Amino acid sequence: MASQFELSVVSAEKEIFNGNVVSVRVSGIDGELGVYAGHTPLLTSIKPGMVKYTLENGKEEFIYVSGGFLEVQPTIVTVLADVAIRGEELDQQRILAAKRKAEDTLSKSNNAELSAKLSREIAKLRVYEIVNSKLANRR
């Protein structure tokens, strides 16, 4: 039995996940972070991307986050994000439409806020693609 710890993923609107996991992987500001039971305490910013966690049965699950914070304590890891969406709830058509709109607007002006929005949509699309390739492999 692998060592477990509690993972809590919370958005500004609601708790997205709370349960025991054996590992979690997050896109930190300075690179990818992998956390296992007994990890050194840590507080860091995370960038838009994927939270990937592994349950005790080996099943991997994915959540898109728009950025936020990761707090690692001895028995609990907390991800706080403005926006967090379970991978299976992502809508490819909406993501692609938002991405196209951001690209079109960005091509007409150089705006840091629009560039950040485009980065978030691309990160969201990556999570969607990973989740769907995993689902296709299960069939």
From Swiss-Prot:
- What are this entry's molecular-function GO terms? ATP binding; proton-transporting ATP synthase activity, rotational mechanism
Q: What membrane topology does this protein have?
A: Peripheral membrane protein
Highest taxon of source = Bacteria
Q: Looking at the UniProt record for this protein, which Gene Ontology cellular component terms does it annotate, in alphabetical order?
A: plasma membrane; proton-transporting ATP synthase complex
Compartment list: Cell inner membrane
Asked if Cell inner membrane is a keyword of the record, the answer is: yes
Alphabetical list of Pfam families matching this protein: ATP-synt_DE_N
Keyword terms, alphabetized? ATP synthesis, Cell inner membrane, Cell membrane, CF(1), Hydrogen ion transport, Ion transport, Membrane, Transport
Q: What does this protein do?
A: Produces ATP from ADP in the presence of a proton gradient across the membrane.
Q: According to its UniProt record, which protein family does this protein belong to? A: Belongs to the ATPase epsilon chain family.
Quaternary state and interactors: F-type ATPases have 2 components, CF(1) - the catalytic core - and CF(0) - the membrane proton channel. CF(1) has five subunits: alpha(3), beta(3), gamma(1), delta(1), epsilon(1). CF(0) has three main subunits: a, b and c.
Q: What is this protein called?
A: ATP synthase epsilon chain
Organism of this sequence: Actinobacillus pleuropneumoniae serotype 5b (strain L20)
Q: Which lineage do the record's taxonomy fields give for this organism? A: Bacteria, Pseudomonadati, Pseudomonadota, Gammaproteobacteria, Pasteurellales
